[in-house]
Curated annotation (Swiss-Prot):
Record InterPro entries: A-crystallin/Hsp20_dom, CS_dom, HSP20-like_chaperone, Small_HSP
Protein name per its UniProtKB record: Probable 15 kDa heat shock protein
Xref: PROSITE patterns: SHSP
Gene name as annotated: hsp15
Domain sHSP: 21-130
Keywords assigned: Stress response
Organism: Leptospira interrogans serogroup Icterohaemorrhagiae serovar Lai (strain 56601)
Family to which this protein belongs: Belongs to the small heat shock protein (HSP20) family.
Length: 130
């Protein structure tokens, strides 16, 4: 009886998987560099349209994502080396950034992010004698 339940569950899972289109997750290639004022990130997202690029900042997590497909192809696809699917990559920021000043420019399949570093707050503490 136990085997029948397991087989049925496995069959259901297998059936559901075959119904869904498999989505391929791709990690975009990046270059990251910085200077005293900014962190710069360049992400290669070939084939992704600007409207499909997303950049999110959640606490110290920077998330880059986008989608590409080969929907516009006419005729029967015989051979393909183009990468299609979803791009997604998450980075943990090791420095504080000014969220309101982050800029993102997308041109020729390359996402260029500029993340201004937050200036360290220094507070002078008064020392008293007792």
């Amino acid at each position: 009886m136990t085997n029948a339940v397991l087989n049925e569950k496995n069959h259901s899972v297998t059936s559901e998987e075959t119904k869904k289109e498999r989505v391929r997750i791709l990690a975009p290639r990046v270059d990251i560099y910085s200077d005293e004022e900014n962190i710069y990130l360049l992400a290669d997202l070939p084939g992704v349209e600007e409207k499909d690029v997303q950049v999110q900042l959640e606490k110290d997590q920077l998330i880059i994502s986008g989608k590409t497909s080969n929907k516009d192809i006419q005729g029967e696809l015989r051979y393909s080396e183009f990468r299609t699917g979803e791009y997604k990559r998450t980075f943990t920021l090791t420095e504080s950034v000014e969220e309101d000043r982050i800029s993102a420019v997308y041109k020729n399949g390359v996402l260029n992010l500029t993340l201004p570093k937050r200036k360290p707050l220094t507070k002078k503490i008064e020392v008293r004698s007792e």
